[in-house]
């Protein structure tokens, strides 16, 4: 087998069978499937056997252990050279696996590749991320630069770097930061690999206070990981103080006349000042250069009354190819 599709499953709804049908319909058939039945009652074996006609393995947990445990168990069981991520209630086009395997074949230097995804529920939006390794690494200061459900990766990379507990609902972001620090090479292939379902996502875990807490925590973790020489006391207070403003401004970015844009701008300007001060003391730190460029780019987008999330794929990230960032040994 050329690849294994790994799928953590917890309380999948009626769309589960549709997702399995998408696996059956793939134009590339040289793959198997590893599913984690994460304490579901009744077990999922009957539903899987009735629908999935691909070689597969089900790892059964007697009780719910969470997505990190499910992903790690699935990945540990993979023997194929490539791991492909999928969620239990999402959909994918029939050429997804073929296109991602072809990309990895044609780019042997790339370890992890993501793609765009169409997000649907109350509407339809396209989430597109930066394409090049340098752009992805620079953008990691602000947010995850790969759409997690779209990722395909070399098995040896993921088996050597399991997902970590302790980053609730941000386990992918933490992993990308760790891999970036170690010189793993990223890419995004900008085709739509997944139709991502947002329905049923509005739990208490996604409320404003929970989002704020995760935002501050992961933003600080990003700085500590990507900028190991940074003075945490210097950089993180601005992040903490500005987090409420940034959170309030996220939705406001849809409206170019919203005062939320000004709040995001002020926070970005404060962070940029701190980054520039750090860069003057550590001119050898390539990550700080990337962070400064990413922050200036974000400011330019805000000042142009554009959204920073790159929805609809209309925003082109600035190039960072002139920077010297960590590479694999």
PLM feature spans:
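Short, acidic, metal-binding catalytic loop of nucleotide-sugar glycosyltransferases
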Residues: 21-30
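A conserved acidic beta->alpha catalytic loop
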Residues: 37-46, 63, 87
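Acidic donor-binding/catalytic loop of UDP-sugar-dependent glycosyltransferases
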Residues: 43, 90-102
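Glycine-rich, basic loop-to-helix element that forms the pyrophosphate-binding segment
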Residues: 61-78
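Short aromatic/hydrophobic "clamp" motif used to bind/position activated sugar donors
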Residues: 83
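Conserved donor NDP-sugar-binding/catalytic core segment of glycosyltransferases
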Residues: 97-126
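Conserved nucleotide-sugar donor-binding catalytic segment
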Residues: 134-218, 229-238
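Conserved small/polar residues in nucleotide/adenosyl-binding loops
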Residues: 320-327
